[in-house]
């Protein structure tokens, strides 16, 4: 696929967007078009927007060429599912990976604009919070740099987690309204919107055409998932992958009849309820409503992402039983592990596969990254909440659990300890990590010691039963953002000593 892309890229990417005079003129035109101002009248924030759109114009050509090359090569694609992506600021990182940072800096200096000042106008994308989110962001950067076809899939949080302020020596938490000025690097893709259903009941019937069992969800509530695509630029190779984050919208966002009757709150009630799903990263789950909202968030982005990838796959392939030959679903921690039963649901209820066929596909498609050795941090959901909010998904989880425990009892007859530790459904809870391990073809830790502890202590029973699944992938960070961009003087010194190969290969 990389070779196919390079052939396309060499033809498509003699891009004049970074020729100095052309770039400067584009920035001036963007200021005029966006704000009806001259460059001298524009605020630093407005200049940031204009520069970002000029950079995006260049990225777009690569983006289109990359996706075209992937499509022509029919390349296997990884879908990296994560509750967070701690991306950091996009402008500087994109310029570094386009190998155009110095050129743009010089062009702006000729316009009496300091690129560092402009970069400071960009808020951090509030799509993540900690190491889990930064790992996801670094993986996306590396995948693009190494020419791997990949999508990141997550949620377009409106306020992130929180913005920290210090008042009288104490932390004060306020909403992080990072989208207040808009995000110049994102593209709204309304044409790929997906419906996501919650609650209701499941009715069983026989399909008169096929004679197969059919499960019908009734009396449900649904929201519309709207994708926003952000470019992930590979370093110096003209490859641009995609981070797709989902916004939530009501199916019927405004009820005019309620408004005309004076029921103003009811007129927008459904839209407000939909917005709650994407308002905040990790809402407080110390109460039932918070737990329900978190589970809604997880199913929301997973269901939308899986519907989208299945639709994309079916454009070129008629046999969904071979999905695993073209798709990998990497679950970053336990938050996305509802992907296992959701993929089963789509394959059985929508595509008409048998249980055995669907399980064969799912168990060859899904992989799981574990981030913790603490039992209390391995996500669990109350069965009453899970079954009420996701009734069909719960039925599938029950069947996965039942079939797996038959295998456990066959391998370890009479060993109740094994059953207790390895069951998905136990003590009134749905244990998401157990489900991910049972269904995934790969289970990795993120450091050698961490993985060893998983094998010998925390997940020992699973390791003894299926050792071939376990492996280690030591965490790292991208040297392009944190060294080439973060410390350019040190980066130049290193390059003077050993050349610039370290930018893409630290080995």
Ranges and model annotations:
Residues 9-507:
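A conserved ligand/cofactor-binding region detector
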